């Protein structure tokens, strides 16, 4: 361990074999860490329980700290643990002979954890040897690779072998850092904290939603959060972790921008370019996974494969003739390349991201846990340019945190940058490096339905798209911004579902950023103006012609505005003047057709104020149901009638002018446009007389319109009243018929039950030897009638039994029908008067149905 390790003489196959061994070592350590994580969690829970119980002095003295059982004399005595100094019972501790002390079960598990994790070994060895194990092997392999590339002598000036590398550097490069990951600001701890914070946030959202018990939307939101709690927690935790990592990267890139780039020799860059072009991007061989950083285990591999990094604009190629290299499929903080295929990206990386690796471009300053002791190691650190993945995590306080800046980072605004006709200076500077990697979601279709998703809903893909543009966030902060656009962007970013895609989609088209809002405002104003205009004729008195024109205009504009609004929700960018003209023509055609059908029933005359009130009622009722244009036109027959009346007025006026002109002389002059013949009359006619005739015609037309409206109103009222009366009569009559039928059926069944009872008695007497004959004389008439009918039935049945042959079938049917009718009429008469029958019908029906059922069973 203390000897100098020289791996410069190994071949490629031997180096690959050594790397496989190192990778197996890392895999075994990862499995061991997973196995011990459950034990660590159990010990943490026990420690938190003890911290709470230890505050009660009476409990500590009289009860066991582990099982909480009370101490008793000679049965369950208390013993003090040698490690935690708590009083425990006999069943919760064991005696250590070599220590001559009692140790509780929890302290024994803690000792076992320390022994299995080899923490005691590294605590003793790290004071003697600064670098050992797998870290030492990788260090030497990296040095060998740097020597082969020829860059190490240029960096160090040939002083690489002058110092002993075994006594240099810091303890951060040793294997103990792997086992100390869970104690410091590691990615695993950060992910655990992010998961806990996300879970608390989801719980708080659920509790807030459940607080509104009277709101159905809140209850639905709470149920959705409960059903998708795990998915939302994972997405939110991933977003928090990416935000922390992005913040560190932005800080390092800002410092890289201020510092000069590290020069690379031409020979090294040429060699790497040749190797990069010869290696295929997807051609990972078996040892390709060996160069995966151990810190990458904190996040799933799917996210790592789906988040390609965006290169910083300051990284320019050293040689313009080189082919552009394929970017690594993993982020720079958790991806490493192979030694034989150097893509000028991080080559080697320790489990916590602290030890040296190969990286091109201007290196960010390294953040090691200890300061190196010599210039050799400093040169290696500068060349490696590896920043810790969890350095300075959680250092920001709540007051210093800028939420607008965080939202600007989370929102991928860089999608709109390539569409900007005037690029920023930073974009012009990076234009010669090749196109910047764009997000896959930038090619989405601008469908408005995609912007109105549920809740739905933020997905894991949105949080991953946020990570794609993390390295361009500091460029957008430096670039000048438009205050209005920035305000609109911030409003778009403040989404309830934490979905930054909305803002990017709304501002994706920079050529027409304000057309949609202006169009929407214009249509909204027009719609409100039409609604206000439709209410003014009822408040302000005016002439009949003005009222008709206003109502006609407002009703048509109201229909058009509602149609525009309904179509605008479907496709706001496809509304043109041509479609509006077509829709308006179709409305007028439908209005003409409806008016011809509905104005044919006009016979009476009614006043104009009643017509206006009816128009307002119909227009208000039609606004509530805007399912289709035809249904609105059917309900707004008053507006349609107004359109028809105005058309008829024009026709009558034109016909009158033609008749007047024909009476004075033949109309031989050519037709001229309406605007020219306006105000012109034929020769030889009196203008005053024509005005009087036209005025009288207009008055007659309006009076006829009032008559039509009055008749329509009366017809509608009569139809409603008739419908109500008809429906009410049908229901009551049907109920009476049902009651009568049920009563009759119950009475028939009751009579049949009595008959069957009598028959059973007669049969019993006959079996006993008695000869029963029907009685002829009765004392009372009422009993005589009833018994005569009953005895008639019994007599007929007894006679049928005594006859040698059954009677004819037709006679049997006739006899049974006649007797049934008589029994029914008799029982119906005995129910009482007609006034009491309706009151007792329901109760009697229910009571009589039960014996009917019993009689059916007896048959």
Curated annotation (Swiss-Prot):
RabBD domain ranges (all copies): 4-124
GO MF term set: actin binding; myosin binding; protein kinase A binding; small GTPase binding; zinc ion binding
Biased composition (Polar residues): 618-629, 787-796
Disordered: region residues: 251-285, 302-374, 386-629, 783-812
Cross-referenced Pfam families: FYVE_2, Rab_eff_C
Biological processes per GO annotation: intracellular protein transport; positive regulation of insulin secretion
Region (Negative regulation of PKA-binding): 232-248
Modified residues (Phosphoserine): 298, 350
Zinc-finger ranges (FYVE-type): 63-105
PROSITE patterns: RABBD
Subunit architecture: Binds MYO5A, MYO7A and F-actin. Binds RAB27A that has been activated by GTP-binding via its N-terminus. Interacts with PRKAR2A. Interacts with components of the exocyst complex, including EXOC3 and EXOC4.
Name this polypeptide is given: Rab effector MyRIP
